[in-house]
Amino acid sequence: GDRKAQDEMLHAAYESGVAILTTRTTAAHAMSYQITKKLGAAHGHACMLTLPHLWAHLAAQAEYQPMLTELSRILGGEKPMDGAILLKGLLAVLELDKIPMPDDATLDMLAASVNPERLGNHPEALTTAQLRAIYVQAFTPMTDTERAEAIAAWEQYGK
C-alpha cells in the first residue's frame, strides 16, 4: 500500500517500455517468452538460460571478441568468455541450470516462435537453426568440470 513506491514502479515500467520501443530487446529476452509460457520458467530465469550461450555464439567470432572482452572486464574477468562463465556460475549456484531438455517438437516450436523484429538489438541476425542450437545448448547440462569452473567464477566475483 505504499503510494510513492507504486508511483515509482509505474514510472519505471513506463521508462522500460520506452527503452524497449527505442532499442528493441535483447536476443535472450526475445527467446524467453515461450520458455516461460510452455516450460513454466520465470521470465528472468528464461533469459538467463540463453544469455551465456548467446554470448558464446558471439565470442566464437573474432569481430565480437573486443566487445565481449570489455564486458567481461566490467564483470571482473579478462577473456571474452569470462562473462558467460560467470553467468553460468550464477545459474549453477542458484540451482537454476537444471531444466530438462525439451523434446524435438518443443525445441522446433521455441526456435520458430522468436520474433525476428525482437532480435533487432542483437549484433547479428540469427537464423531459426541458430536459435534452435542455442536452445539446445541452454538445456544441455554442464559437465561437472564446466559446472565447477562456473561456480568458482561466481564465487570469486566481487572479491
Name these PLM-found stretches.
Residues 19-25, 80, 96, 100, ...:
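Intrinsically disordered or highly flexible coil/loop and linker segments, enriched in small
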Residues 3, 25, 45, 62-65, ...:
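Non-catalytic, surface-exposed connector residues within folded enzymatic/regulatory domains
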Residues 14-44, 116-121:
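Glycine-rich phosphate/pyrophosphate-binding beta-alpha loops
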Residues 38-39, 44-106:
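Gly/Pro-rich interdomain helix-loop hinge
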Residues 9-17, 51, 87, 91, ...:
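Short alpha-helical scaffolding segments that buttress acidic/His motifs in well-ordered protein cores
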Residues 5-8, 27, 31, 46-50, ...:
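Residue-level detector of well-ordered alpha-helical segments, enriched
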Residues 105-159:
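Short, amphipathic C-terminal "tail helix"
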Residues 1-23, 123, 129:
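Carboxylate- and glycine-rich phosphate/diphosphate-binding segment that chelates Mg2+/Mn2+
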